[in-house]
Amino acid sequence: MKKQQRFIYLHLLGICFLGMQANAQQVGFTTENDAYLLKLEDDYYTNGIFLHLSYADQSKKNTKRVHRFELGQQIFTPLKRNTRTPADIDRPYAGYTYIQYTRSWFNNEKAVVQLTGTLGIIGPASGGEGLQNTYHRWLKYAPFLGWRYQISNQLVLNTGVLYAHNLIATKKFKWMGWGAAQLGTAFINASVGTKMVYGLFNINQSSQLWNAAVEKKGMPKKEFFIYWNPKITAQGYNATISGGSKTAADSAVTLH
C-alpha cells in the first residue's frame, strides 16, 4: 500500500495546468500511468485513458454552465504481476470502460455545483486485459498472469453530485472545501476534501481547475498553478473490488 499512497501523493501534488486558448468547445485527452514516474512495475491503479469534450453556455439567469462528455477506461491489477493463484491476488483484476456526462454550474465566483451520470461496463467486456497486454508488449514489460481471475462483467449505471465553495481567495492562493457522493450499481461512496491552489489562476467559472476554461464569448486569462487535493472517502461499495451479482458463481477473485 505504501507504493499506492506514494503514487496518489505525487499525482495530487504535482499536477499543474498551463493556460490554453479557450473556445466555446474544447477537446482534450488525458493519460495516467505509473510508467510516467519512471517505474518498471505497476501499482493497483495501473492505467487510465480519457477523451473528453466540453462546451459552455449561459442559462436564463446568466449562470455559466459547462457540459462535459468523457469516454474513459481504467485498469486495476494486483501489486505483483506474477500472481498465478487466487491466494496471491491482493487486489482483484478489473477493467472499467465508461461514458460520462457532467454538468457544472457556476452561479457566482465562490460556488461550484456538478452533477454526473455514468454508463459503463466492468469486466472482460471493458477491454482492459487486451489493452494492458498490448502496451506491455510494446514497452517490453512482463505481462500480468492472473487476468483469468478478473472481475465478471457488470453494467455500470451511476450518478454523482459535488458541491465546492471558496473558503479563502487571494490573487495567488485559494482554499476551497468540497463534498461529493456517488450512487449506483458500481460505486457507492461519499467524500469530503479541500483544494489548496497556488499560482496564477482564474475565478472558478473560467478555470481549468474545474474544467471550465471554455467560454461562449471571449477568452479567459492564462493560468499556471499547482494544487493539493487531500480527501477522506467513506466507501460503501466498489464493483472493481467486490464484483457484480454473478461473481460468486464463477472463477473471479473479489475482496469483501
PLM regions with names:
Residues 31-37, 73-79, 105, 121-127, ...:
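Transmembrane beta-strands of outer-membrane beta-barrel pores
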Residues 63-132:
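Long, hydrophobic/aromatic-enriched structural stretches that serve as scaffold segments
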Residues 37, 79-82, 202-206, 210-256:
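Outer membrane beta-barrel transmembrane domains
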Residues 1-26:
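Bacterial Sec-dependent N-terminal signal peptides
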Residues 25-61:
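N-terminal ordered "arm"
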